[in-house]
C-alpha cells in the first residue's frame, strides 16, 4: 500500500486535503463513504486496509438492496486521515468540487481472512457498522485487472441478504442527504456553513 499516486495528483499548498501518511500498524478497520460532487456526482467507498484507505468510486452510490450490483472503480489509496475530510476542493485541483462524509463507521471481515488478503484475491466480504450502511457487503473484482496495468480496475459492490437489506432503498431520499460528521447538506458545505455537531457520531 502506498500514497505515492494520491500525493502526485494533488498540490497540497492549494487543496485542504490531508497529506497523510501510511500507518504501519495497519490495524484500523474503519470505513467511510464520501459523496463527491466533482465533474460528475459519485460516491467514494473507502476501507482501511494496511494503514491506508483502499478506495473505489461508485457512480450510483452504495445500495442496501441486494438486487443492485453497483459498479465500483478502484482508485488510488488515500490516507486514513481522509476519512474525516469534508469540504471544498478548489477549482483547478484534482477532484475539484464538494466532498461530504456521507457515512462513517467500522467494518469487520466476514470470512476468517485478513482484508488485505481478500483484496489481493479480488473478493472482499465485510460487515459494515455505519449510520446509513449496515450488515454484510461483498466487493468483487469483475476481471483480473490490476491498477498497475494502467487499465481501469472494475469491481461490483453488492449488499448481502440479511436483516439490514432494504429492497426499497433510495439513496436520493431526504433521509440520506446530510453529513454524518457535521450534519450539513452539500449546499451548506459549499457555502462554508458551520458544522452541526451532535453526540453519538462514529470515531475513526
Where are these regions (language model features)?
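A charge-rich, low-complexity, intrinsically flexible signal that marks solvent-exposed coils, linkers
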Residues: 1-204
